[in-house]
A protein has these predicted regions:
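Acidic ATP/Mg2+-coordinating residue in the GHKL
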Residues: 161
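Short conserved segment of the HATPase_c
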Residues: 166-179
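Short conserved segments within the C-terminal catalytic ATPase subdomain
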Residues: 99-109
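Short alpha-helical Gxxx[C/S/T] motif in the catalytic ATP-binding
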Residues: 194, 198
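Short beta-strand/loop element within the Bergerat-fold HATPase_c
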Residues: 141-153
């Protein structure tokens, strides 16, 4: 009985957050319209860049909450199909195109020409989160590279940046829920949820993810998309 009550309360809380997320999308859309109006009237306004970046971050946080809530019933939401990896990559890059321009970050990406068996929507979220982190921790004028490499005898998608890197003592914990590490403490804006969600999603899809990094040189995120056993837990 206690478990049943806890489950009901948990569902009520999830429903509340879900409603909140959908409702907050309306003022965010209105802010986009207002910001566009300001830009039309005064395109040289120095604060425009910062306003755009902060609004984009707000959208990402809302999307992260929505994904976190959907994780509860992810198993019933998975739809595996053969899909072009380039299609997913291009959609993800397009979403962040404004950030690449605003931060003057170069993208080194050539079509990988691979078909993968995956859930397009969930894999796209994972790639978006990795790009978001790369942009967040790469200085203006830096570079992000997307390519294929063979690791552990398997072909992997690699998303690499030449940003600030991750401290060696933090690397084993980057996928822990709520862990922000040195970079997160310095940045004071990290939620410690993005990479946690990536790992959970990749595990449930039977894919693999791991990270190599060196402070001052950058970070490489590896996605092994050959499907292992599906894990619905």
């Amino acid at each position: 009985e206690l478990k049943s009550e806890a489950r009901i309360k948990g569902q009520d809380l999830s429903d509340y957050y879900g409603m909140w997320v959908h409702q907050i999308k309306t003022p965010i859309a209105a802010m986009h319209i207002l910001l566009q109006s300001v830009e039309d009237e005064n395109p040289a306004l120095p604060e425009l860049k910062e306003m755009k970046m902060e609004l984009f971050k707000m959208e990402q946080y809302v999307e992260m909450v929505l994904t976190y809530l959907r994780m509860e019933d992810m198993s019933g939401d998975l739809q595996f199909e053969k899909v072009s990896l380039d299609k997913i990559l291009k959609q993800s890059v397009r979403k962040y195109s404004q950030m690449f321009v605003l931060q003057k970050i170069r993208l080194d990406y050539r079509p990988v020409e691979r078909i993968v068996l995956t859930d397009e929507k969930w894999l796209e979220f994972v790639i978006e989160q990795i790009l978001s982190n790369a942009l967040k921790y790469t200085k203006n004028g830096g570079e992000i590279r997307i390519c294929l490499e063979e690791k552990r005898g398997r072909e992997c998608l690699v998303i690499e940046d030449n940003g600030i890197g991750i401290q060696a003592e933090d690397l084993p914990r980057v996928f822990e829920k709520g862990f922000t590490g040195y970079n997160g403490r310095a940045d004071k804006k990290s939620t410690g949820i993005g990479l946690y969600l990536c790992k959970k999603i990749m595990d449930k899809m039977g894919h693999k993810i791991w990270i190599n990094s060196e402070v001052g040189k950058g970070t490489r995120v590896y996605l092994e998309l050959t499907r292992q056993e599906w894990n619905p837990e």
